Amino acid sequence: MRQRPPFIVSASDLPEHSHAYPQSDEPMGPSRRLGAAAGLVRLGINLQRLPPGTRSSWPHAESDEEEFVYVIEGAVDAWIDGTLHRMVAGDLAAFPAGTGICHCFINNSDREALLLAGGEAAKAVNRIVYPVNPSRRVDLKESDWWHDAPARELGGHDGLPDALRPRKDI
């Protein structure tokens, strides 16, 4: 059998990477960097696993990088500008650059979810804003913070998975 070219990769052959934001011990859902492994440099494509009670990232918006998330398996809550929207397998959410649409994905279900997340790879001109976590600004270079992000009204949800809230029945 012929060896496959390096731009054909199998997700199962790639390590999972997980991260937590500085000054936080909350792990974000682990992902496999498919695009980078296949040699893409201008497009990031990640296979992200969201166990119950986790989220993809902190709520954020980007100035110059388009992003998308496609639900492969399970169900997640798309946190869009402070309001939750249920997404199931086959649903896609797209975030055009510069709109200021703040987003993250939360697994409040009791089953694991699998997402395909993609977007333009780190552009030097891109800026980011974390409206629910303004303390994140101190972890970034001043030039990386999106100071003039479009003002968008935020709903009442705080962007946290239900599992991170104190239980009321105790």
Where are these regions (language model features)?
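A short, N-terminal "cap"/entry segment at the start of jelly-roll beta-barrel domains
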Residues: 1-42, 128-170
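Conserved short histidine dyad/triad with adjacent acidic residue
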Residues: 28-33, 46-62, 100
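A generic structural signal for short beta-strands and their flanking turns/coil linkers
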Residues: 30, 41-46, 65-67, 74, ...
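Short, conserved beta-strand element in jelly-roll/cupin
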Residues: 47-51, 61-79, 118-121
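Short beta-strand segments
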Residues: 57, 85, 126-128
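Short hydrophobic/aromatic patches on the structural cores and recognition surfaces of FHA
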Residues: 74-76, 90, 105
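Short acidic-glycine-tyrosine-enriched beta hairpin
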Residues: 82-98
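Ligand-binding loop in jelly-roll beta-barrel domains
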Residues: 97-125
